[in-house]
Every structure is written in C-alpha cells, then in structure tokens.
C-alpha cells in the first residue's frame, strides 16, 4: 500500500523527534501537502521539511491536532496486525501488575494506540474509540481484541465529547456478544458492580485504584465523607477498610443506587448513607448542621476541561476544598483529587495551602498519588498525565 505524504514545516519535527506523537495543523506545510486533500482517518507518511520520513501518521485534518503518529517505521500502518501486536504488549504489562483481569487494558497514546481506550471487566471489554482513524477501523479493533483476549462480550462506549472534535457521532452499542447492564469487578480486594451501559465513561474509574488503596490506614474506625461519590469507588472501599460510617454525596440518583448496590455486595450497607444533591449545597447544609468528619474525600469531575476554563476551574477547586476542610475534625484527613489535565499538581497544592491558611489551619502533606500503572504516563507526552491525589492532614493552628 502506497500512502500519500504529509510534510512538516522546517523545524516542526523537533517535538516529534523528542518522543511526542501529536502533529498540530500549524506545523504542516499546507502549500506542499494541503490538509484538505485528506479525509478524517486517512493515513500518511509524515515527512520532515527536507522529505525525510518520520513515520506513519493517522489524520484528523479538520482538528488542531491534525495527526497522531502511529509508527516510526513506515512499513507499519494501523491495521489488525499492528493492533494485535500493540494490544499484546499492553496486556503483558497489565498481567504483570494485576492477578485478576480488572484494569485499563489500553490507554491511548501511552500504549502507542492513539484514540483507543479499553477497560477490562473480566471477560467483558468496554471500548472507547476517540479518533476518526480508530472509528474507521473498528472492525479491525474488534478482531484484534477477539484474537488476543477471546472475551465473552465487547461494548462500544462511544458517547464521549472527545468524538465531537473528530466529527464522529456518539453512540453506545454491543460490538460482540451481549453486554449486561452491570458488570462485576474487584479492586483492592473489594467487590463492585459497574454500570457499563449507562454509567459515566466506561462505567468505572480504574485510574484511582492505588490512591483508594492508600485510604486503609486513615479510615479505620473513622467517619468518612465521600464527595462526588459516583457508585462508591472511594466510599465503599473506606467502609470495607473499616470506617465506622461513610456518607456518599452525588447529584445522580442512579449513581447512588450503585452505591447502595455495592454496599450490599460487600456487607457494609449499615455503615453507608447516601445524600442526593448538588455537592456544594450539601457541603453548606452539612456545615450548617455542624457535622464533622474524620476523613473527607474530594474527587470531583474535571472542573478544567480546556485551558480557557483554568481561572473558573481553579476557583471551583478552591471553593470545594475549603468547604471540605470546614467539615474536618481537629485532626482530620483530606484526600483532594483532580482529573483535570490542565491543573498542575503544584497548583492544586497551592490551592490547598491557601484554603488551609484562610481557615487558620496547618496542613501537612502525607501522601501524593497519580494514576495507576494501568494508565502509564508517556514521559514525552505530558498530556497523558492527568490524575493528582494529595492526602493531607489538617491541624488547628495553635
């Protein structure tokens, strides 16, 4: 197969040669190789300004990120063979890390499969196709997954906003077999059922696995507040780890049904209470009622989805963490997390310092965490690092 060329401007290859995989539209020599000559999902040979090939790129010509490097070898295009090879490499890491088949199997760019995310729930796979190139080759993606893993069922969970930029429709559909509404998983020895069809993202957030494991020594015999609880990833584990009482707060009645379901599954239903409503309003009401907690977990959805949201997003993180601190006992633990890629950890740390000072409390950083190793960070692609988790101790100033 002979592929067309996509030529870069002079010196535009530096970031790519340093290891990054993304090509921006303003880096392309459109006089030599017009982007409008390509269709979304096409592949091309990426060339330096002097014509030297850099590899194979998959194209999204109408996007700012107009291409993603698939291979640095021009003989290796995105096809079933390459997918099988890369999925096997991804699988070998996860099987080394985990003794049970519950993990993120493929994490996009970090696993050298840009636009592809696969979460594994035993013999059920939930797949997100976030690029035109992957959508165009979804039959090959499915065939590769069936060959490598032989699952009982595969779900296309393609309802992410990331597809909008690619001009792709959102949909959720069975790709293979029959996917149940809820699937079983185990994390840190705690059992869960996740709503893969109707739930958020793939139905579960494996990225905080290691951070949730760190809860154990802090929650035994303690009263715990889990904010933005979803189906209880943090809260149910806190209860299973020995918390005396857990309150889960979420705006979604459906999510809180999941909390109750998972509490019952682990025999901790009598220790878990659910509060449905806006988290900020719930925080105000809890403060007005003079409620106090030994541990507060604040793991909100991304307040900063784009760079232009930075100012408002930082204000939201500040408001959330300060209100959470107001509910802590004198020697309390705050787990403050962020999944906003655009919020650096140092900025989250500064927010916590400022909030603690505003409340005249001392703050100690006990542990810092990131995403688990099934979400490996590609060190040349800082955008692949997004999870921050800071476990802090709040003390009176005196």
Report each predicted region and the residues it spans.
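Non-catalytic accessory regions of SAM-dependent methyltransferases
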Residues: 1-120
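Non-catalytic substrate-recognition/targeting regions of SAM-dependent transferases
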Residues: 106-119, 135-205
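Conserved SAM-binding loop of SAM-dependent methyltransferases across substrates and taxa
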Residues: 231-244
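S-adenosyl-L-methionine
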Residues: 254-297
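C-terminal catalytic and target-recognition region of SAM-dependent MTase-like enzymes
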Residues: 319, 333-398
């Amino acid at each position: 197969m002979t592929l067309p060329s996509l030529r870069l401007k002079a010196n535009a290859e530096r970031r790519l040669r340093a290891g990054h995989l993304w090509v921006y539209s303003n880096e392309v020599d459109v006089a030599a190789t017009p982007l409008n000559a390509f269709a979304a999902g096409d592949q091309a040979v990426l060339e330096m300004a002097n014509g030297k090939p850099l590899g194979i790129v998959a194209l999204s010509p109408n996007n700012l990120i107009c291409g993603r490097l698939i291979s640095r070898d021009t003989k290796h295009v995105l096809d079933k063979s390459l997918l099988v090879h890369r999925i096997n490499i991804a699988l070998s890491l996860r099987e080394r890390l985990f003794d049970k088949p519950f993990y993120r199997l493929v994490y996009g760019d970090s696993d050298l499969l840009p636009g592809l995310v696969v979460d594994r729930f035993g013999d059920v796979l939930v797949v997100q196709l976030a690029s035109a190139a992957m959508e165009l080759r979804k039959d090959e993606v499915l065939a590769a997954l069936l060959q490598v893993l032989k699952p009982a069922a595969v779900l296309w969970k393609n309802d992410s906003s990331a597809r909008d930029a690619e001009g792709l429709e959102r949909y959720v559909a069975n790709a293979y077999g029959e996917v149940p509404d809820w699937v079983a998983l185990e994390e840190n020895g705690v059992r869960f059922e996740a709503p893969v069809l109707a739930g958020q993202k793939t139905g579960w957030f494996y990225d905080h696995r290691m951070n949730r494991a760190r809860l154990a020594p802090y929650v035994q015999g303690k009263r715990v507040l889990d904010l933005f609880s979803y189906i209880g990833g943090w809260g149910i584990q806190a209860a299973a780890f020995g918390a005396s009482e857990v309150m889960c707060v979420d705006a979604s009645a459906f999510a809180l049904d999941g909390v109750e379901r998972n509490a019952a599954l682990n025999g901790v239903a009598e220790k878990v209470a659910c509060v449905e409503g806006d988290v900020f309003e719930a925080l105000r009401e809890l403060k007005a009622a003079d409620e106090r907690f030994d541990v507060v977990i604040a793991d909100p959805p991304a307040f900063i989805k784009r760079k232009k949201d930075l100012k408002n997003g930082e204000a939201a993180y500040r408001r959330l963490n300060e209100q959470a601190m107001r509910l802590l006992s004198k020697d309390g633990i705050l787990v403050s997390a962020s999944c906003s890629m655009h919020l650096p950890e140092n900025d989250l740390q500064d927010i916590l310092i400022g909030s603690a000072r505003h409340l005249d409390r001392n703050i100690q950083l006990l542990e810092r965490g990131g995403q688990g190793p099934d979400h490996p960070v590609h060190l040349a692609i800082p955008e692949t690092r997004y999870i921050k988790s800071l476990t802090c101790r709040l003390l009176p100033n005196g």
